[in-house]
Amino acid sequence: LKVLKEQTGGTPQRILEAACGGGRISVPLAQAGHDVTGFDVDEYMLMRCYARISGIPNIRCYCADAVTADWGRDYDVVLMAGNVLINIESETDYAEAQATFIKKAACALRPGGHLLMDFDLHGNPEAVFNRLKQSSYFQGTDEFGTTGKTIGYGSVFDPVTRICEATGHWELTTNNGETFIYPSGGGHKHIPTQRQIWGWLEDAGLSIERTYKGYTDEPVPDPVEGYCKTTVWAQKN
């Protein structure tokens, strides 16, 4: 919201959010006065989104596969947040799917429109993803009293393919105390380089106007040497 307000002067925008999930970002955007459309492939997350948007007239969401679906046209802003680039589920080659996301975002913009993209950049992914250690990155309880948490066992990173493979399981405890354990199979993620992402933006006809490091006003260094939470504001040529 801060970046959008800074770049648009607070003028209401027609916004598309790809992979909107439960509406964590889309709903506040609509409440701020923007006209918002969101889509996601996860029907269960969309159920949460449908519940949250009830009574808000300037937001709608629908179910679609971002890799294969048409994203629409003539949006002022397309938003790709929440590390969407490394959380794509598709049968397509991972790097190809990442490039496709950016191309589709560009196609959905009006001339002069902007892509707002938020993601993690890893200049040294081996240091982050080569680890064998149990950890949990999520735990929560839903409105029915079901508690869930993730348990990760570790991951390995291949510097040639830039694929990170991880394994772990989900633990679910229902409101009557019954516990279930589901193997998650782990993650299969392509960790793109800064050059790749910058190149995909250029190939899609997008010009980077501003970058933000770690949600501050400091620009993202080029090259990034370690880890950098990155926000990009890019205009359609």
Residue ranges with predicted function:
Residues 76-96:
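A short SAM/SAH-binding and catalytic strip from SAM-dependent methyltransferases
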Residues 1-11:
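Conserved alpha-helix/loop element of class I SAM-dependent methyltransferases that forms part
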Residues 188-237:
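C-terminal lobe and adjacent flexible extensions of AdoMet/dcAdoMet transferase-like proteins
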Residues 68-77:
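A short acidic, Gly/Pro-enriched loop at the edge of an enzyme's catalytic core
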Residues 116-198:
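SAM-dependent methyltransferase
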Residues 24-68:
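Class I SAM-dependent methyltransferase SAM/SAH-binding core
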Residues 95-111:
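A short glycine-rich, Lys/Arg-flanked "PGG" loop and its adjoining helix->strand segment in the class I
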Residues 19-21:
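Class I SAM-dependent methyltransferase "Motif I" SAM/SAH-binding loop
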